[in-house]
From Swiss-Prot:
Keywords: Amino-acid biosynthesis, Histidine biosynthesis, Hydrolase, Methionine biosynthesis, Multifunctional enzyme, NADP, One-carbon metabolism, Oxidoreductase, Purine biosynthesis. One of its GO terms (cellular component) is cytosol. Catalyzes the oxidation of 5,10-methylenetetrahydrofolate to 5,10-methenyltetrahydrofolate and then the hydrolysis of 5,10-methenyltetrahydrofolate to 10-formyltetrahydrofolate. It comes from the Bacteria. It comes from Histophilus somni (strain 129Pt). The lineage of its organism: Bacteria, Pseudomonadati, Pseudomonadota, Gammaproteobacteria, Pasteurellales. GO terms for biological process: L-histidine biosynthetic process; methionine biosynthetic process; purine nucleotide biosynthetic process; tetrahydrofolate interconversion. Belongs to the tetrahydrofolate dehydrogenase/cyclohydrolase family. This is Bifunctional protein FolD. NADP(+) binds at G166, A167, S168, I232.
Length: 282
Protein backbone atom coordinates (compact mmCIF):
# COMPACT_ATOMS: atom_id res chain seq x y z
CA UNK A 1 0.00 0.00 0.00
CA UNK A 2 1.50 3.40 -0.98
CA UNK A 3 2.52 5.79 1.77
CA UNK A 4 0.13 8.43 3.05
CA UNK A 5 1.34 11.92 2.19
CA UNK A 6 2.02 14.31 5.08
CA UNK A 7 1.11 17.71 3.63
CA UNK A 8 3.01 20.64 5.08
CA UNK A 9 1.04 22.95 2.80
CA UNK A 10 -2.26 22.15 4.56
CA UNK A 11 -0.89 22.09 8.11
CA UNK A 12 1.04 25.35 7.65
CA UNK A 13 -2.19 27.07 6.53
CA UNK A 14 -3.94 25.92 9.72
CA UNK A 15 -1.06 27.11 11.93
CA UNK A 16 -0.95 30.50 10.20
CA UNK A 17 -4.74 30.83 10.53
CA UNK A 18 -4.50 30.19 14.29
CA UNK A 19 -1.65 32.71 14.65
CA UNK A 20 -3.64 35.35 12.71
CA UNK A 21 -6.73 34.72 14.88
CA UNK A 22 -4.73 35.24 18.08
CA UNK A 23 -3.17 38.43 16.73
CA UNK A 24 -6.62 39.80 15.81
CA UNK A 25 -7.78 39.00 19.34
CA UNK A 26 -4.89 41.02 20.82
CA UNK A 27 -5.50 43.93 18.44
CA UNK A 28 -9.19 44.01 19.41
CA UNK A 29 -8.06 44.37 23.03
CA UNK A 30 -6.18 47.52 22.01
CA UNK A 31 -2.74 45.91 22.13
CA UNK A 32 0.01 46.48 19.59
CA UNK A 33 0.77 44.01 16.80
CA UNK A 34 3.73 41.61 17.15
CA UNK A 35 6.87 43.03 15.52
CA UNK A 36 9.46 41.18 13.44
CA UNK A 37 12.74 42.64 12.15
CA UNK A 38 14.14 40.86 9.07
CA UNK A 39 17.79 41.51 8.20
CA UNK A 40 19.27 40.58 4.82
CA UNK A 41 22.96 41.23 4.12
CA UNK A 42 23.90 41.21 0.43
CA UNK A 43 21.84 40.17 -2.58
CA UNK A 44 21.92 36.36 -2.64
CA UNK A 45 18.96 35.42 -4.92
CA UNK A 46 17.84 32.41 -2.83
CA UNK A 47 17.99 34.48 0.37
CA UNK A 48 15.93 37.23 -1.28
CA UNK A 49 13.23 34.67 -2.16
CA UNK A 50 13.14 33.32 1.42
CA UNK A 51 13.02 36.80 2.94
CA UNK A 52 10.24 37.83 0.55
CA UNK A 53 8.19 34.80 1.61
CA UNK A 54 8.64 35.66 5.30
CA UNK A 55 7.65 39.30 4.75
CA UNK A 56 4.50 38.27 2.85
CA UNK A 57 3.52 35.91 5.67
CA UNK A 58 3.91 38.75 8.19
CA UNK A 59 1.63 40.95 6.10
CA UNK A 60 -1.02 38.22 5.78
CA UNK A 61 -1.05 37.45 9.52
CA UNK A 62 -1.03 41.00 10.89
CA UNK A 63 2.57 41.01 12.11
CA UNK A 64 4.39 44.35 11.91
CA UNK A 65 7.46 43.68 9.76
CA UNK A 66 10.51 45.92 9.56
CA UNK A 67 13.00 45.19 6.77
CA UNK A 68 16.73 45.89 6.76
CA UNK A 69 18.32 45.16 3.36
CA UNK A 70 22.00 45.83 3.96
CA UNK A 71 24.73 45.95 1.30
CA UNK A 72 27.21 43.07 1.03
CA UNK A 73 29.95 45.47 2.23
CA UNK A 74 28.28 45.79 5.65
CA UNK A 75 30.83 45.10 8.40
CA UNK A 76 30.30 42.68 11.25
CA UNK A 77 30.35 45.55 13.75
CA UNK A 78 27.67 47.46 11.82
CA UNK A 79 25.44 44.37 11.87
CA UNK A 80 26.02 43.81 15.61
CA UNK A 81 25.18 47.47 16.31
CA UNK A 82 21.89 47.13 14.41
CA UNK A 83 21.02 43.95 16.33
CA UNK A 84 21.77 45.72 19.62
CA UNK A 85 19.37 48.53 18.66
CA UNK A 86 16.67 45.98 17.77
CA UNK A 87 17.26 44.11 21.05
CA UNK A 88 16.33 47.36 22.84
CA UNK A 89 13.35 48.23 20.58
CA UNK A 90 10.07 47.54 22.46
CA UNK A 91 8.13 47.32 19.16
CA UNK A 92 10.26 44.39 17.95
CA UNK A 93 9.57 40.90 19.35
CA UNK A 94 11.59 38.83 16.91
CA UNK A 95 14.88 39.35 15.06
CA UNK A 96 15.62 37.26 12.00
CA UNK A 97 19.04 37.42 10.34
CA UNK A 98 18.87 35.60 7.01
CA UNK A 99 21.65 33.02 6.63
CA UNK A 100 24.11 32.48 5.06
CA UNK A 101 25.93 35.73 5.82
CA UNK A 102 28.94 36.98 3.80
CA UNK A 103 32.09 35.04 4.75
CA UNK A 104 33.73 38.01 6.49
CA UNK A 105 30.92 38.03 9.09
CA UNK A 106 31.00 35.49 11.93
CA UNK A 107 27.52 33.91 11.94
CA UNK A 108 27.94 32.42 15.42
CA UNK A 109 28.82 35.80 16.89
CA UNK A 110 25.79 37.36 15.18
CA UNK A 111 23.39 34.67 16.46
CA UNK A 112 24.79 34.99 19.99
CA UNK A 113 24.25 38.76 19.85
CA UNK A 114 20.47 38.41 19.37
CA UNK A 115 18.54 38.56 22.64
CA UNK A 116 17.40 34.96 23.42
CA UNK A 117 13.83 36.22 23.92
CA UNK A 118 13.86 37.65 20.36
CA UNK A 119 15.66 34.69 18.74
CA UNK A 120 12.70 33.42 16.70
CA UNK A 121 14.97 31.18 14.60
CA UNK A 122 15.75 29.25 17.81
CA UNK A 123 19.49 29.16 17.06
CA UNK A 124 20.85 30.99 20.14
CA UNK A 125 22.89 28.66 22.41
CA UNK A 126 20.59 29.63 25.31
CA UNK A 127 17.50 28.38 23.46
CA UNK A 128 19.22 25.22 22.19
CA UNK A 129 20.41 24.61 25.78
CA UNK A 130 16.86 24.94 27.12
CA UNK A 131 15.68 22.34 24.60
CA UNK A 132 18.56 20.09 25.68
CA UNK A 133 17.45 20.42 29.32
CA UNK A 134 13.81 19.61 28.42
CA UNK A 135 12.50 23.13 29.14
CA UNK A 136 12.18 24.57 25.61
CA UNK A 137 10.99 28.09 24.85
CA UNK A 138 11.82 29.33 21.34
CA UNK A 139 12.71 26.29 19.23
CA UNK A 140 14.40 25.94 15.82
CA UNK A 141 11.69 26.33 13.19
CA UNK A 142 12.33 23.40 10.84
CA UNK A 143 12.66 20.72 13.58
CA UNK A 144 9.62 22.15 15.40
CA UNK A 145 7.67 22.10 12.13
CA UNK A 146 8.66 18.47 11.62
CA UNK A 147 7.38 17.58 15.10
CA UNK A 148 4.03 19.17 14.17
CA UNK A 149 3.98 17.10 10.96
CA UNK A 150 4.71 13.91 12.93
CA UNK A 151 1.79 14.71 15.28
CA UNK A 152 -0.61 14.59 12.32
CA UNK A 153 0.23 10.92 11.67
CA UNK A 154 -1.27 9.92 15.03
CA UNK A 155 1.70 7.58 15.59
CA UNK A 156 2.90 7.30 19.21
CA UNK A 157 6.56 8.35 19.11
CA UNK A 158 7.55 6.79 22.47
CA UNK A 159 10.17 4.09 21.93
CA UNK A 160 10.37 4.60 18.16
CA UNK A 161 13.83 4.43 16.61
CA UNK A 162 14.44 7.77 14.89
CA UNK A 163 17.37 8.11 12.51
CA UNK A 164 18.55 11.53 11.34
CA UNK A 165 20.74 11.83 8.26
CA UNK A 166 22.70 15.10 8.56
CA UNK A 167 24.03 16.81 11.69
CA UNK A 168 23.75 20.53 10.93
CA UNK A 169 23.15 23.12 13.65
CA UNK A 170 20.01 24.27 11.83
CA UNK A 171 18.22 20.91 11.40
CA UNK A 172 20.05 17.72 12.40
CA UNK A 173 21.22 18.55 15.93
CA UNK A 174 18.09 20.34 17.21
CA UNK A 175 16.00 17.63 15.48
CA UNK A 176 17.79 15.00 17.58
CA UNK A 177 16.89 16.92 20.75
CA UNK A 178 13.24 17.28 19.67
CA UNK A 179 12.90 13.55 18.99
CA UNK A 180 14.66 12.70 22.24
CA UNK A 181 12.19 14.95 24.07
CA UNK A 182 9.36 13.07 22.34
CA UNK A 183 10.60 9.75 23.74
CA UNK A 184 12.38 8.34 20.69
CA UNK A 185 15.63 6.41 20.61
CA UNK A 186 17.74 8.65 18.38
CA UNK A 187 20.62 7.92 16.00
CA UNK A 188 22.33 10.83 14.22
CA UNK A 189 24.35 10.01 11.10
CA UNK A 190 26.80 12.32 9.34
CA UNK A 191 29.60 12.32 6.77
CA UNK A 192 31.85 10.11 8.95
CA UNK A 193 29.15 7.48 9.56
CA UNK A 194 30.04 4.00 8.35
CA UNK A 195 27.43 1.84 6.60
CA UNK A 196 24.71 4.49 6.32
CA UNK A 197 22.39 1.98 4.66
CA UNK A 198 22.18 -0.23 7.78
CA UNK A 199 21.30 2.78 9.98
CA UNK A 200 18.62 4.01 7.57
CA UNK A 201 17.14 0.51 7.30
CA UNK A 202 16.59 0.41 11.09
CA UNK A 203 14.63 3.69 11.18
CA UNK A 204 11.00 3.74 12.29
CA UNK A 205 11.22 7.49 11.72
CA UNK A 206 13.70 8.78 9.14
CA UNK A 207 14.59 12.48 8.85
CA UNK A 208 16.92 13.35 5.97
CA UNK A 209 18.50 16.82 5.85
CA UNK A 210 21.64 16.78 3.73
CA UNK A 211 20.90 18.83 0.61
CA UNK A 212 21.98 16.17 -1.90
CA UNK A 213 19.36 14.97 -4.39
CA UNK A 214 18.21 11.36 -3.90
CA UNK A 215 21.09 10.50 -1.57
CA UNK A 216 18.81 7.95 0.14
CA UNK A 217 17.60 5.20 -2.23
CA UNK A 218 14.01 4.04 -1.68
CA UNK A 219 15.13 0.43 -1.22
CA UNK A 220 16.94 1.40 2.02
CA UNK A 221 13.67 2.38 3.71
CA UNK A 222 12.28 0.05 6.37
CA UNK A 223 8.78 -1.28 5.65
CA UNK A 224 6.22 1.00 7.36
CA UNK A 225 8.69 3.78 8.28
CA UNK A 226 7.74 7.46 8.49
CA UNK A 227 9.95 9.42 6.07
CA UNK A 228 10.57 13.16 6.52
CA UNK A 229 12.52 14.68 3.61
CA UNK A 230 13.96 18.12 4.45
CA UNK A 231 16.06 18.43 1.28
CA UNK A 232 15.16 20.90 -1.46
CA UNK A 233 17.30 20.41 -4.57
CA UNK A 234 16.84 21.60 -8.14
CA UNK A 235 17.45 18.89 -10.75
CA UNK A 236 16.61 19.47 -14.45
CA UNK A 237 14.40 22.40 -13.51
CA UNK A 238 12.40 20.41 -10.95
CA UNK A 239 12.52 20.46 -7.13
CA UNK A 240 13.42 17.09 -5.61
CA UNK A 241 14.26 15.92 -2.11
CA UNK A 242 17.14 13.99 -0.55
CA UNK A 243 15.09 10.77 -0.66
CA UNK A 244 14.21 8.80 -3.80
CA UNK A 245 10.50 9.59 -3.44
CA UNK A 246 8.80 7.15 -5.84
CA UNK A 247 10.54 4.07 -4.45
CA UNK A 248 10.44 5.22 -0.81
CA UNK A 249 6.69 5.86 -0.96
CA UNK A 250 6.12 2.18 -1.82
CA UNK A 251 7.69 1.11 1.50
CA UNK A 252 6.94 3.96 3.92
CA UNK A 253 3.68 4.32 5.86
CA UNK A 254 3.89 8.15 5.75
CA UNK A 255 6.10 10.44 3.67
CA UNK A 256 6.55 14.19 3.10
CA UNK A 257 6.58 15.37 -0.52
CA UNK A 258 9.08 17.84 -2.01
CA UNK A 259 7.89 20.51 -2.53
CA UNK A 260 4.92 20.91 -0.17
CA UNK A 261 6.22 18.97 2.82
CA UNK A 262 8.66 20.44 5.32
CA UNK A 263 9.30 23.73 3.45
CA UNK A 264 5.99 25.51 4.19
CA UNK A 265 6.23 24.50 7.86
CA UNK A 266 9.48 26.42 8.43
CA UNK A 267 7.88 29.80 7.63
CA UNK A 268 4.71 28.87 9.58
CA UNK A 269 6.76 28.06 12.69
CA UNK A 270 8.66 31.32 12.30
CA UNK A 271 5.32 33.15 12.56
CA UNK A 272 4.34 30.89 15.49
CA UNK A 273 7.62 31.75 17.27
CA UNK A 274 7.10 35.48 16.63
CA UNK A 275 3.72 35.22 18.38
CA UNK A 276 5.30 33.29 21.29
CA UNK A 277 8.02 35.94 21.65
CA UNK A 278 5.37 38.69 21.55
CA UNK A 279 3.33 36.96 24.26
CA UNK A 280 6.43 36.60 26.47
CA UNK A 281 7.17 40.34 26.06
CA UNK A 282 3.56 41.27 26.83
Amino acid sequence: MPAQIISGTELSKNIKFNVAEKIQHYLQQGKRAPGLAVILVGADPASQVYVGSKRRSCEELGIYSKSYDLPAETTEQELLTLIEQLNQDPQIDGILVQLPLPKKINSTKVIEHISPTKDIDGFHPYNVGRLCQRIPTLRACTPLGIMKLLETTGVDLYGQHAVIVGASNIVGRPMALELLLAGCTVTVTHRFTKDLKSHVHQADILVVAVGKPHIIPGEWIKEGAIVIDVGINRVDGKLVGDVQYDEASKKASFITPVPGGVGPMTVAMLMFNTLLAYESHS
